[in-house]
Amino acid sequence: MNLAISIALLLTVLQVSRGQKVTSLTACLVDQSLRLDCRHENTSSSPIQYEFSLTRETKKHVLFGTVGVPEHTYRSRTNFTSKYNMKVLYLSAFTSKDEGTYTCALHHSGHSPPISSQNVTVLRDKLVKCEGISLLAQNTSWLLLLLLSLSLLQATDFMSL
């Protein structure tokens, strides 16, 4: 009986870990805020447990998430939004003191080791502005619609009028 329970538990864990994966983590600057876009897959029925953290000088600082307790110094500076396959964290008043390696990690539940994570090293003077990234990287449907509309208008000779 114990063997059957162990096998069932192992299969459940394998199924969940296969269905939850961080696909990318990007960083950019919006005004004076750092924006972290954590894109992920979730093909399992289990809810996603996640954590954003900063490692600076070998010390890990939890910023936000459902795993771990965010440090007091970051609580008032973070703003979080979530979509189906993306978690977005804003860190306001970003300065060179906030430079380091940022991590987005997915967990099974509680304080278990992460099943998937991505890192990005952030340096203030190397950050790009988000405006150029967000239009194309987050929502390309409007661009596709515009291109198709222009082709349709050109095909109907509307452009030559």
Swiss-Prot record:
The modification Pyrrolidone carboxylic acid is found at Q20. The modification Phosphoserine is found at S82. Residues 1-19 form the signal peptide. Glycans are attached at N42, N79, N119, N139. Residues 20-126 form the Ig-like V-type domain. The keyword DNA-binding does not apply. Keywords: Cell membrane, Disulfide bond, Glycoprotein, GPI-anchor, Immunoglobulin domain, Lipoprotein, Membrane, Phosphoprotein, Pyrrolidone carboxylic acid, Signal. It is a lipid-anchor; GPI-anchor. It is found in: Cell membrane. GO terms for biological process: angiogenesis; cell-cell adhesion; cell-cell signaling; cytoskeleton organization; focal adhesion assembly; heterotypic cell-cell adhesion; integrin-mediated signaling pathway; negative regulation of axonogenesis. It comes from the Eukaryota. Residues 131-161 form a propeptide. May play a role in cell-cell or cell-ligand interactions during synaptogenesis and other events in the brain. This is Thy-1 membrane glycoprotein.
